[in-house]
């Protein structure tokens, strides 16, 4: 989420992880990042790491994908990440935690581009077996 990224500080990036302190749903969230990415984005040890100008980020994204709806530039990156995460064999529960969703249903809307993986989530669901014991 743009608001979360805009507030990242150097002290929030520790050992290959980003700690989001101020999230949309109010809970702290930790996500893993590659060491190479950490060295690129952690340009200082403390304080804000970037100019939180949405217009600058939107402009950069628009040069790559100019047909995005207004207000959706950064948001589409979340969908793209979710899609590729699932296509690469990611776990829907892990994706839910990374995206900071409170329900799995929210996460499933993000992963709608990878229906085969969602079917696996249903097929391998151990709770589904419990339904045979319920009338």
Residue ranges of each PLM-predicted region?
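C-terminal catalytic core of tyrosine-transesterase DNA break-rejoin enzymes
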Residues: 1-4, 78-105, 109, 116
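Conserved beta-strand positions that form and line the central face of beta-propeller blades
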Residues: 17-19, 48-49, 73-76, 106-109
